[in-house]
Amino acid sequence: MANQTIIDTVMKTVSPVIEPPYELVDVEYEKMGSDYILSVFVDKEGGISVEDTVTLTELISPLLDAIHPDPFPEQYMLEVSSPGLERPLKTPEALTKAIGSYVNVSLYKAIDKVKVFQGDLVAFDGDTLTIHYLDKTRQKTVEIPYQTVAKARLAVKL
């Protein structure tokens, strides 16, 4: 089973049980060295604690063990954690919540010869992201069609 199919299966299985105040942010499945790691990223207002990750792991693990047929080709390690400061913004809802935040947006196709923009997300209407960014010393604004976004995440301003 391809990694994306595994990720989709895990998302479909665990998303109904991750209830407020928690939010399922992302799922990743990858090989690290000789091990497979299934990472489930969960967040809540104010961040999650170690106790939260233990509680969520105890909730999620039996659900994954009950999936039939087993989608995992090998044994894996389950990791439940916070998405961190540079959390991915994978849905329109996540982008809407991120308005006013500093973001990094990678594009499938360049706009004015630029494929990566980093700046303040000032608006998102479901179709277009508006970002204020610094080009050398000049403040600029770019409007990015949502369908051209390859990857978006929160960014840390240094």
Swiss-Prot record:
Keywords associated with the record: Cytoplasm, Ribosome biogenesis
Biological processes annotated in GO: ribosomal small subunit assembly; translation
Compartmental location: Cytoplasm
Domain of life where this protein originates: Bacteria
Family statement: Belongs to the RimP family.
SUPFAM superfamilies associated with the record: YhbC-like, C-terminal domain (SSF74942), YhbC-like, N-terminal domain (SSF75420)
UniProt-listed InterPro entries: Ribosome_maturation_RimP (IPR003728), RimP_C (IPR028998), RimP_C_sf (IPR036847), RimP_N (IPR028989), RimP_N_sf (IPR035956)
Listed name of the protein: Ribosome maturation factor RimP
Record's keyword annotation contains Cytoplasm: yes
Major subcellular location class: cytoplasm
Function, in words: Required for maturation of 30S ribosomal subunits.
Pfam families (alphabetical): DUF150_C, RimP_N
UniProt organism field: Streptococcus uberis (strain ATCC BAA-854 / 0140J)
One GO cellular component term noted in the UniProt record for this chain: cytosol
Cysteines paired by S-S bonds: none
Record's signal peptide: none
Gene behind this protein: rimP
